[in-house]
């Protein structure tokens, strides 16, 4: 604890070294229906842009979340292997993941397939922590990861890239941006990734490979009928893995397509209409013990209307109302359990923002009408008060939910009488936000109820479990002309109702990322630490720390070279285990990336 106090005091001192007038802030969209500047945000948020991704060179999204944001992420091996993300000590299926604002979580067991997202085609990531169902709907108990593939620089150019790494890793990347007119822009990206992989269990000698083809596209058109934006992300391929030590493989397909129309009706209101569709498909290549080829397929279609700037209010820009309808179709076959079901959820939601006497008040609500369990109300209430010109104190409370997914309702042990899982949380945040430096010190407490688990007496799933978490988080972000710093320290106590530590979640974690421009190079050093964790069967996962270094060099305006040295100390570390074995992670390795911009 003394080390943590010293670090906090150091961070507070650093902010005074770079005190400047408050001018420009990042715009945050993940925690409210009303986009806000970062100095108006109470809830903890991490925002990663393309510049940060280029400097740190993460090999995949899982490693970025773990090593640069101190988030607990468990992996069943290397690139493309199953991974689980635990935000704020919640379960892995309590994290909502969106691509271009479109939900990609499956309606079956487990979380979203973030391991199929190519980090080289991501433009920015926003992560909101805590209960956010009032803004995003079901699943946002622990938080939301919102990933954008939209190009942040609207100019005509094209580029090709190549990457190589250990275990015969190779990637080819093509990007194309076209500015047709001042009011129309297109960007397209394509990547192909292949790796032979390595043995994913300590007792295995079998390499487990991965193939991925990803295509992204965004078309923006501004006209007299409003602004139109078409977004697309698709990924497909093959992944090899182990089941009880035996080699198997599966084909996968993910996509998220959306069409958005926004417009302002002068003197009346502004509106936004979103039409989206997404898919999460897994097809096994090896038959189960019944001789059947299992599959899970979630198809989700949604329609959303958001109305803002309604002139009936005194400050119309500070009020938002919306309606959302979602149709979810699931085709499921697993070890003899088969079903096809459709579920419809209708929601009505709203947000408001008030400011007076140096105090900001944010409120959000959502009433969801689920076809099975009927109505549920989620909400957030936040107060942010100025203490002086630089310091602000925020207090927030919220309630969020996760609807039981189709496999819990209709699968093995299914129960159509299940209720939604609930998280009620509160948070106190002390913030110092400047033009080039942000400091956040917060404490939080979460209580999870109605958690779904298997009742071995009645041999059915029931809402029978509870869990809680409380903790402290410190974030410090500094951006200067030739160097950047991001430091995150977390201490928490995730436990079930019997007091046992929740599986695969650490009590302490930290990340330190420093980038410096030096002699034409950009050098980035990353240090991360995770405390002890526990896995199934009481297996202990030891604490570990990692050191990574990335070097980037622009030889001219067209040619760029990057080198990533990962796990420099060659640590053996584990984030997941089986009943009698550990899943392995990448040892010391080097990753090389070349990018060349075509044309003039």
Regions found by a protein language model. Name each.
Residues 354-361, 436, 444-447, 463-536, ...:
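Gram-negative outer-membrane beta-barrel transporters
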Residues 146, 153-155, 163, 175-252, ...:
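Periplasmic-side early beta-strands and strand-to-turn transitions of outer-membrane beta-barrels
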Residues 61-64, 81-86, 98, 113-118, ...:
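N-terminal periplasmic accessory domains that precede
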Residues 62, 66-102, 106:
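Extracytoplasmic beta-strand/coil segments of soluble accessory domains associated
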Residues 102-130:
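Short acidic/polar hinge/loop motifs at secondary-structure boundaries
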Residues 27-54:
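N-terminal periplasmic "start-of-domain" segments of outer-membrane beta-barrel proteins
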Residues 449, 552-600:
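C-terminal beta-signal and adjacent terminal beta-strands/loops
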